[in-house]
Regions:
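Transmembrane helices of ABC transporter permease
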Residues: 17-30, 77, 83, 150-201, ...
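Transmembrane helix-loop-helix hairpins at lipid-water interfaces of multipass membrane proteins
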Residues: 18-87, 167-172, 284-287
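Juxtamembrane loop-to-helix connectors within ABC transporter transmembrane domains
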Residues: 95, 115-159
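ABC ATPase nucleotide-binding domain helical subdomain, centered on the C-loop/LSGGQ "ABC signature"
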Residues: 108, 326, 402-404, 412, ...
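Loop segments that connect adjacent transmembrane helices in multi-pass transporters
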Residues: 123-128, 201-251, 321
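Cytosolic ends of transmembrane helices, especially the final helix of ABC transmembrane type-1 domains
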Residues: 205, 224, 228, 252, ...
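Helix-to-loop junction immediately C-terminal to a conserved catalytic motif
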Residues: 393-395
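C-terminal portion of ABC ATPase nucleotide-binding domains
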Residues: 523, 527, 531, 545-588
Length: 588
């Protein structure tokens, strides 16, 4: 699966650290399981019981009496604990470094993937949602690896080392521990299967609850104006009740699992004592062996009782894993196509072009040419496909037939390379919570203050900036000044012209600008001789006579020509005259 490969590739820079982590884990768990054995031999030596270990017997033979064995054993225990503490400290540092690098690499790969998604996938999924969801999902996976993976690794290693030691003691005592552990494992598997759909439903219910709360806050003015508060409260209670019901099922399941497993753990120790007393009475095992058996049994079974929490984290992790895998399945833009282009001839040619969106033909049989430095306006009624036409030009939609920029066929080019030569200004203003100057400098950081003032004056924005206390250093957005929609659109125009491109597209970019400023800006742009093609999408068809060429979209077809020529088309003439009546001829 794609996310699995991405996770593995995100860990490749930490191979050495992972190896160190595993080696330290082996050392820690081995010494942890060997400490009870040292105590066992210590007890058995003091009680004059049989010690079936050649190395320990040799070690004991070095001392003249038992009392001299006591401080040496204590030193050995403290030294072992010291090694465990030091190894644990180094392992923690190593793990944190692995997690830090892994989290950074994984988020970087996912963010890079999101940035390169096709326009269709961006359209279906909000960028903010994609980034936020992927960040949350990465955090879930990282938290599982950081907190639970170490626990699982230690558990596996403890079982391996402990079973080896128990096998040397007594098989009957080992059976009690093994049976108790198997019952807990079976219960854990049952819990895993039962909790999986509950956790998935819980996440879904929590998301619905969050969405409802967010909608209520976002639309609070609308609800107040229309007295919808009580209805919204009812809907909120319904969503909250659904969330509560799912949570209640989870609580019942957790309570049952924990009750059974804790009962098994509590029953296990008395059972071992009873069996041990018979074995001890018959001289089969020693007191030290009983201690070791109980110690190991409690270590293993108590570790398994925490398996429910691990499995809950695992289920949550799997939900995130699936979501990230679905994210990575989204289509990327064609990175393998030619991206080493520089458009010298900005002639745009549509020849027998058909544009489809989600399988539906929006525009068909498009045939027209836009020459360099030509001022073109694209008009048509709402929904006629004006924006789709030019978004296809920059690679947002697929098409049949031919659409060329100069000698290059658009569908054969890398989308990023196309957009390096085309500037698309949308109706929405995309600004950052920075100063006005910083927003203007995003494309060209080295632009000078006089150049900013000159461009701002060109787009009738400088006089507005002068009214702010901090001028171009005024912060916009949160805790800053509030720009009107028209001011935002003018700021975006200034920013775009810090780095003009061979083809400039204005997709209803003046919609919020007042009529006087709109006329001044349009006159400035139309009189600007900078060898760039300028294409305007607008509902203001009354502006058509100002342009070199008009492309009129109607019922999926396109007509192109000068204003006087298109007046022969009845639909165009009707649309033009209707708009002219609304605004008055003095605006034209």
């Amino acid at each position: 699966m794609k996310i699995f490969k991405t996770i593995i590739s995100s860990l490749k820079h930490t191979k050495l650290l992972i190896l160190i982590f595993f080696l330290l884990s082996i050392v820690i768990t081995y010494l942890t399981t060997y400490i009870p054995v040292i105590i066992q031999y210590f007890i058995d030596v003091l009680l004059n019981q049989n010690v079936n270990n050649e190395s320990i017997e040799f070690f004991i033979s070095l001392f003249n009496d038992k009392l001299s064995f006591i401080p040496i054993t204590c030193i050995l225990l403290f030294a072992t604990e010291g090694i465990i503490v030091l190894s644990t400290y180094i392992r923690t540092i190593t793990k944190n470094k692995i997690i830090q690098e892994f989290q950074f690499e994984l988020k970087l790969k996912l963010f890079d993937h999101i940035q390169n998604l096709t326009y269709q996938d961006f359209y279906k999924n909000s960028l903010a949602d994609l980034v936020q969801n992927s960040t949350d999902d990465v955090n879930n996976i990282v938290n599982f690896i950081e907190k639970q993976f170490t626990y699982i690794l230690d558990l596996v290693l403890i079982i391996i080392f402990a079973i080896g030691q128990l096998a040397n003691l007594n098989i009957r005592l080992s059976v009690v521990m093994i049976v108790a552990t198997l019952i807990i494992i079976i219960l854990s598997i049952w819990y895993f299967k039962k909790s999986k759909p509950i956790i998935e439903n819980k996440i879904k219910a929590q998301k619905e609850l969050y969405t409802k709360i967010n909608d209520n806050y976002s639309n609070i003015k609308f609800m107040k104006v229309n007295n919808l508060q009580e209805k919204e409260i009812e809907r909120f209670e319904q969503v909250n009740n659904n969330n509560f019901e799912v949570s209640k099922k989870k609580i019942v399941l957790d309570s049952f699992y924990k009750t059974i497993t804790s009962s098994i753990v509590k029953t296990q120790t008395p059972a071992i004592f009873i069996i041990s007393s018979f074995l001890y009475a018959n001289g089969i095992i020693s007191i030290g062996s009983i201690y070791v058996t109980i110690n190991y049994a409690n270590k293993i079974t108590r570790a398994f009782t925490d398996l429910a929490e691990i499995l809950e984290f695992f289920n949550l992790c799997m939900v995130s894993y699936k979501r990230l895998n679905n994210l990575l399945k989204l289509t990327l833009e064609d990175e393998d196509k030619n991206n080493n282009i520089q458009i010298k001839n900005s002639t745009i040619t549509f020849k027998n072009a058909n544009i489809k969106v989600n399988g539906t033909t929006i525009l068909s049989n498009l045939n027209f040419t836009i020459k360099p430095n030509e001022k073109v306006i694209i008009v048509g009624s709402t929904g006629s496909g004006k924006s789709i036409l030019l978004k296809t030009l920059i690679g947002f939609y697929e098409y049949e037939g031919s659409i060329k920029i100069g000698d290059y066929e658009v569908k054969d080019l890398n989308k990023k390379a196309v957009r390096e030569n085309i500037c698309l200004l949308l109706q929405d203003s995309y600004l950052f919570s920075r100063t006005i100057a910083e927003n203007i400098k995003i494309l060209v950081p080295q632009i000078s203050y006089p150049e900013i003032v000159e461009l701002s004056s060109f787009f009738s924005f400088h006089s507005d900036v002068q009214k702010f206390n901090d001028g171009y250093d005024s912060k916009i957005g949160r805790n800053g000044i509030a720009l009107s929609k028209g001011q935002k659109q003018r700021l975006v125009l200034v920013r775009a012209y810090t780095k003009p491109k061979p083809i400039m597209i204005f997709d209803d970019s003046f919609s919020a600008i007042d009529r006087i400023n709109k006329k001044n800006i349009l006159d400035n742009l139309l009189s600007l001789e900078d060898n760039s093609s300028k294409i305007f999408i607008t509902h203001d068809i009354e502006l058509a006579p100002k342009f070199d060429k008009i492309i009129y979209l109607n019922k999926g077809q396109a007509l192109s020509g000068k204003h006087e020529e298109l007046l022969n088309n009845e639909n165009y003439k009707k649309l033009y005259e209707l708009n002219l009546d609304k605004v008055g001829e003095e605006y034209v």
